[in-house]
Amino acid sequence: GDAREAMRVRCASELPGCDLMALLGDLERSAVLSALARRGRRIDPAPWGKPLGRIEVVNLRVFQDSEGFLQFFNVFHATTRERVVEREVLVRPGERWDQQRIDESRRKLRDRTFSVLAVIVPVESATPGAVDALVVTRDVWSLRFDFNARVQGDKFSYLTFSLSENNFLGLRKLLAAVYEMDLGAVGIGPLYIDKNVLGRRYTLRTR
């Protein structure tokens, strides 16, 4: 609404009275409050221009306590490793807090293949004059079965299905077994996709 947009402008202009929590949706706010309580942290309301001290990651489970028996299925999901999330933050320790680069980092982390939620908030640092970053993420369920087919007349002109792990070993890499058939050929084999080769924003795709 108008109030949120006014607050967004205030924060973008780095003005006093900026409330970063007011810019979050309900699910994001709840996740951040839970992470703050878990780590004993407090929001830094004026991080701009301060050097970054630490980057701390809290990665929430796919199924939360409120989802009852579904929590059992968490054992079949490899939660994204903290170091994998941490390296996506473009502002590095020792550099000044830059909200534009923080926002870009958040957009990278919110890749829907891997995350349903990603928030980066400034928190008070133990180092005088510095600010720490608290990164809160929540994975999506990563085991997938995909199927696609096209029919011409009474036969398949194209057929493919795959079983994939979209977050292999918690590394944000995709590994799949794929069957693919068209009118001219049949193929079966593994598929590997890495969207962050050697920590850089390159994509590696191989079959």
What is each of the regions a protein language model found here?
Residues 1-207:
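Immediate N-terminus of the mature polypeptide
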